[in-house]
Amino acid sequence: MSIKSDRWIRKMAEEHGMIEPFEAGQVRFNDAGERLVSYGTSSYGYDVRCAPEFKVFTNVHSVIVDPKNFDEKSFIDVIGDECIIPPNSFALARTMEYFRIPRDVLTICLGKSTYARCGIIVNVTPLEPEWEGHVTLEFSNTTNLPARIYAGEGVAQMLFFQSDADDVCETSYKDRGGKYQGQRGVTLPRT
């Protein structure tokens, strides 16, 4: 497997709809000239943006967190240009971008250092071959202070790894009917 460059990312997005909407360059400023957390195509990756819909974890109902039987009341919905995550808590969000991963590609997501340096960790599982959808993002606030996440700005970087032509997977995410295939919006745990 080899990591793919900006040229490959642009080609796959523009000719095959791998990323929609797609930004061919790096965006660092908004229309008013204010600095943003960058997003768009980088040398060997794509920096995704957070959509303006969040689910912030709350313990107001004192439910048990169970991935096999997840209670939606564990979250408060927040819509807006920013989201405040309580100390030592987390929030779910989604990418603005919709992904269509080719059969011979595995995509790994890493958090941006701008957030990591503030104690905010982004977690996403790999985007498997032939998976498609909005990526659900998990933001952990590891600090004992409230933390702010910005919608419409960069939050994580996707790295694309392509297998050799003679080593394409036998069974893709789509082939096995993965439970998160085609997800739109912030998607909670499914079993």
Swiss-Prot record:
EC nos: 3.5.4.13
The UniProt record lists the keyword Hydrolase: yes
Keywords per UniProt: Hydrolase, Nucleotide metabolism, Nucleotide-binding
One Pfam family recorded for the sequence: DCD
InterPro entries the UniProt entry points to: dCTP_deaminase (IPR011962), dUTPase-like_sf (IPR036157), dUTPase_trimeric (IPR033704)
Residues annotated for dCTP binding in this entry: 112-117, 136-138, 157, 173, 183
Major enzyme class: hydrolase
UniProt pathway annotation: Pyrimidine metabolism; dUMP biosynthesis; dUMP from dCTP (dUTP route): step 1/2
GO terms for biological process, alphabetical: dUMP biosynthetic process; dUTP biosynthetic process; nucleobase-containing small molecule interconversion
Catalytic activity: dCTP + H2O + H(+) = dUTP + NH4(+)
Subunit annotation: Homotrimer.
HAMAP family found in the cross-reference section: dCTP_deaminase
Name the UniProt record assigns to this protein: dCTP deaminase
Source species: Psychrobacter cryohalolentis (strain ATCC BAA-1226 / DSM 17306 / VKM B-2378 / K5)
Lineage: Bacteria, Pseudomonadati, Pseudomonadota, Gammaproteobacteria, Moraxellales
Gene responsible for this protein: dcd
